[in-house]
Amino acid sequence: MSYELNRKLAAPREPLPTTAEIDQVTADIIRGAFETVCFESATYLGRAASSPIINQSNERNAAIVDAHGRLAMGAIGTPHLTFVNQMETRWGLMNQERYDWGPGDVFLANDPDHGGGHLPDYNVYGPVYDEKGELICIQTLQAHQGDTGGKDPGGFTLEATDVFTEGVIYPCLKLVHRGQLRMDVFDFVVRNNRFATFAGDIAAMIGGVQHAVKMLEDLLCKWGSDVVKAAINHSIEHTEKRMRDEISKWPDGTYEGTVFIDHDTAGTKDIKVHVACTVDDGQLTVDLTGTDDRQDLVGVWNTFANSRSYVMTQVITHLDPTIVRNEGMFNAVEIVIPEGCIAQPPPNKPAALGSFHPACEITEAVCVALSQVAPERAQPQLYKIGMPNAVIGFD
C-alpha cells in the first residue's frame, strides 16, 4: 500500500512472447471472439444476479487481461470499470505464487490501495491456462455491490476519514480452488454484507467468470496458445497506432481545464481539479498537477486506479469510437497524477465517495481541455450530481 505500488501497477508491460506470425484477419477474428466472451460473461452476470443494481442497472463490466497484466479486451459494461479491472488483477498477477494460482481458481478483490476503485466495486477474476499449464490470460468481471459491511449501509459514509469505516477490504481472496468452491471463504464474504441478495450476486459473478474461462480455454484449443498470444499483441499494437494517428491530427500544444467541487462533505469549499493535456506529435500527456492536495479534506478522495480510468474514459470520447478498448490506449497516452492529491491519495484514505467527486470533475476537466482541440466531440458532464443528495438523501 504505497505510491511505489501504484507506480508498479501502472508501469508499461512487454508484449507476450510468441513465435507465431499472424495476419490482420485472423487477429480480428480472435479479437471478436474475445469481445463475445466478455459480452457473454457480463450478460451471464446481468441475468443471474439477485440485486437490481446489477440485473437492472447493469453496473458491471467484463474484461480480459493477458498474462503480463495488459488489458487485452475491455468490451462490455460501465465504461470507467473497463480500465479498472486490469489494475486490481495486476496485483494478484504480481503475487500469483503467494496466492497459489492454478487452473480452476477464482479470486475476489476490492482493495482501493491495491489497484481497485471504491470498495463496492467487487472484481472477480479467474486465470486461464493452456493445455501445457501456461498462463495465457485472466477473465475479469467487476460489479458494484449494494453493501460492503461498513459503518453505513451501502458503504458510503459522509464523515469517514479512513477506508476501514467504509467496509471490508479484500486485496486478493480465493473463492474457488481448482474448481471447488471454498465454502468457508464464501460464507465469510457473504456474512460481511447486510443484503441477503449479495450471496446470489457473488455466485453469479463466479459463474460468469467460470463460463468465460471455459470459452477462452476452448479458444486456446482451437487456435493454439501462440496464435492467441500473437493476436493479443497485434490488437494492442493496432489500437496504439490508431490512437496515435487520431492524436496526431490535433495541433501540438498544451490545453488546460480547471473544475471545482463546490465543497467536501465537511463543508470545505472550492476543491480544485486541474488538468493539462499536452499534444506532441501523436503522443498525449494528461497531467493532473495542480489538483487539490489538502490532507484534511473529507469524502473527496478518488483512488489512483479510478482516477486513471476516468481520465482514459473521457479521452477516448474525443477519438474514433471504433478503436478497440485495450492496453494500446495507455501506450499512446501518458497519465500523470501527483502523489498525495485527491486523485492519488495516501494509503487508507476513504474511497467510496470518490467515484462521484472528484471522479466526475476529473472527466469534466479533461473534457474542458480537449474541447479546445476536438470541440465537435466534447460533451457535457451529466454525472455531476450532488453527492449527499445522491448517496444519503439529505437536502
Predicted regions and their residues:
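Glycine/proline-enriched, intrinsically flexible loops and inter-domain linkers
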Residues: 2-103, 108-131, 135-285, 289-395
